[in-house]
Amino acid sequence: MNDLPFWKSKTLAEMSVPEWESLCDGCGLCCLNKIEEWDSGDIYFTSVSCKLLDGESCRCSSYENRWDFVPDCVQLTKENVPDIAWLPPTCGYRLVNEGRDLYWWHPLVSGDPETVHAAGISARGRSINENEIDLDDLEDYVVDWPLTVGEEKDDEDA
């Protein structure tokens, strides 16, 4: 009998749809607009969220119909997660793909969807909706915190 949680005992490819969906911690960081530098390919996060991101819950306000409103929304799949370099370092999909464990604040570990926010990992209170700015000014909103959240825990583990 295997007493390990599914994210420790299965690969991404072996997960059921409900297991896959539950790997999302609800941080909202993947829904922040990013800028890609054309010549280098470098990707920079901004604090500007997709128009569909609910700033309080950090979940998509129209998940099932998101492509009707945001045709270029990137759907994370078992096949493409290994190739998406911009996933935040705390992303459950990225962690499991890399053979790492989920953080203590992940809802699957804590049992509470609010811990991702209480731990300061999510976009809650740190992002602005793209409908509230002139997108020509997107460069003014470049931030590094989506790539540095959770580093304190990583430092403690080292």
Curated annotation (Swiss-Prot):
It holds the Pfam family CxxCxxCC. InterPro entries: Puta_zinc/iron-chelating_dom (IPR005358), UCP006173 (IPR008228). PANTHER family: UPF0260 PROTEIN YCGN. Belongs to the UPF0260 family. This is UPF0260 protein RL1394. It comes from Rhizobium johnstonii (strain DSM 114642 / LMG 32736 / 3841).
